[in-house]
Amino acid sequence: MPGEVVGCISCIKMNFGVQEGTIPRDFIEYDFAEDALDFETQLAEARDVKFTQVLAEPLSIGSHIVCTGTPSEDLPWFAVNIGMGDPDSGHGDIAVHFNVRLPQRYVVRNTRRHSKWGTEETTAFRLFPFKMDRPFTIEVLVDEKQTLWAVDGEHYCSYAHRQPSPHVATWVQVAGVRNATLNINKTDIYPTMAPPPIEVPLRAFIDAPPEPSEPTCWRANAIATLSNGVPEGHQLVIHGRLRPMLHSFAVDLMDGAREWPAPNVHVHVNVRAHVEPHLPRQLVVLNAWYGAWGLERRQRTARLVPGTQTTFRIIRGAGEWSVYADDSMIGELEFRAAPEGVKALRFRGDLYPEQVYLCPATNSPVREE
C-alpha cells in the first residue's frame, strides 16, 4: 500500500540490548589510527636494525648459513635476506627473502628483482616455531635448485631458486633482530642441529602391546631409522590422528635418515586430500626417487575422515609395496630398486603419528572390493 511502511514482525521483536546511536566506550577510547602508526613505526625500526655480512666467495651447493638471535616485542617482524647490489639502499635484488611475521604467526618467502616482489610462499612442514623473547637458530642450506631452511634443528621449509639465484648473491643480511649473528661455512649434512633419529621398534604382531623401551612420543614431520630395513613379509604400521583441516601428507621409505643430501626414496606415498576435495575418495600418488622422480601411480582410493584416528600400513611383498589405510588397500608400487636398501622412514604433513612400529604382515587386511 502506498505510503505505508511494512516491517518484519521478527525484526521488530528482536532486541539485542544496543541503544541506537551509541558506540561502546572501548571503541571511543581506542585510537585505531595511532595503533596503525605505531605498527608502521615498528616496521620502519625493524628495517633500520640490520646486520649485513659480505660474502667472501659465492654461495654454492653445500653452503651453510647459520643465523641466531632473539625476537623482541617492539620489532613485529624480522627477515633473513640473501641478495646482491647495495644492501642498505633498499633497491638491491633479493634472491631469497625469509620474512618472519610474529603477530600473524607465519613466514613469508619471496624474491625481489628490479624492485618488484614475486609471488609469496607461506606453506611449511611444521607449525610456526618462533616466539617473542625466545632465542632461535636458523640454518640455511644452499642446494642446486633450492634453499632448505631449518629452525632449531628441525626442517621447516624449502624455497626453489628464482631469478636472481642465490648462487650469484654477494651478501647475507638479518633485519629486525638486535642481537643477530651470522656464520657462513660449508656442510655435508643438513640440519646440523637435528636430534638423533628414533629407531622404529619391532613388535611380534600387529596388536601386540608396546614395549617399555619404545618411544612414547612421536613428533610430526620426523625421520626415524630402520636399521634392519623392512624384511619381506613385514609391514610398517603408523597409527595416528589426521588433521581436522586435512590437506595432504606423505610417508617415505628411504635409504638414509637425513634431509640432505637428498636420500633415495624407495616408496613415496602421498595422500592429497586438497585435490578436488568434493569427490568421495582422496587422491593417492605413489612414486620413487633415485636422483629424480619416476613415473607416478595415481588413483582415487583413500577414504579418510579428517580429524579422526587412522592406521596406515606399508607392506613389503615379494615384488611390490602394498599400502593400506584403515584396512583398505589404497595402492601398490612395484620395487624399483632392491628393497633391502630401505633404512629410514619419513612422514610429513597432516598425519600426526602416535605409534610407529614394524611387525609381521600375517594378519594384513584384505583388498577392498
Listing of model-derived features with the role each one plays in the protein:
Residues P2-T137, L141, K145-T147, E154-T311, ...:
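Peripheral membrane interaction modules
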